[in-house]
A protein has these predicted regions:
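Residue-level signal for secondary-structure boundary sites
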Residues: 47, 112, 136-138
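Short beta-strand and beta-hairpin "edge-sheet" elements
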Residues: 99-113
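Short proline/glycine-enriched turn/loop segments at secondary-structure junctions
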Residues: 113-121
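Beta-strand-rich binding-surface signature
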Residues: 84-86, 101-103, 125-129
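Structured beta-strand/turn binding interfaces of compact recognition modules in eukaryotic regulators
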Residues: 92, 107, 133
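ATP-dependent helicase/translocase motor core
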Residues: 120-183
Length: 183
């Protein structure tokens, strides 16, 4: 079944679920009907720390409490180069707007790192380095990135000192990401 969507298209969640015949929620959405796995990297509202390093996205696996395992959709993504499941990537820069990046390929070099879960506890997560199949990421306008950073800064201002300290501790070992933008 051919999915009709173009790189850079911005759609809503209802359109995404109709197009891919997948769940309406979650960052990893498996569809047996279309033999796809839809990944949503939500930069607006998410506990996960997905990061771009040039043309490679290090995507955080599924599981919001406790250590993540290589089960369910994490296993599907981990085995995606062998199991025939086509993996599609969307990014969210503004609420309810899903920007289609394209088909991605797992580079086979997954690793684990510490991140905070939804209860604020440190845990091990799986990180999956992904590359766009065509090698060309959709360039994101730098004003979109700046707006996103401002939104995150506003949410940080609402935290108390203890919450900020805990957040800083959890990010201490995390590499800084960078991405290609357009001015």
């Amino acid at each position: 079944m051919a999915i009709q969507i173009n790189k850079g298209d911005v759609i809503n969640n209802e359109e995404l679920t109709e197009l891919f015949k997948c769940s309406t929620q979650g960052g990893m959405r498996r569809s047996h009907k279309t033999n796809t796995l839809v990944l949503v990297s939500n930069h607006v509202k998410s506990i996960y720390s997905d990061r771009w390093f040039g043309k490679e996205l290090h995507y955080t696996g599924m599981g919001s409490i406790g250590d993540q395992t290589l089960g369910t959709q994490n296993k599907t993504l981990y085995e995606s180069n062998l199991n025939g499941v086509e993996v599609h990537l969307f990014e969210v820069f503004e609420l309810r707007e899903y920007t289609y990046q394209g088909v991605v390929v797992y580079n086979g070099k997954g690793y684990q790192e510490n991140q905070t879960d939804i209860d604020g506890n440190q845990r091990k997560v799986w990180m999956f380095p992904l590359e766009l199949k065509d090698g060309k990421p959709v360039r994101v306008n730098d004003t979109v990135i700046k707006k996103l950073q401002e939104t995150k800064q506003k949410s940080l201002r609402k935290l108390n000192t203890k919450q900020i300290k805990r957040l800083a501790e959890s990010k201490k070992e995390t590499q800084q990401s960078y991405r290609i933008t357009e001015t």
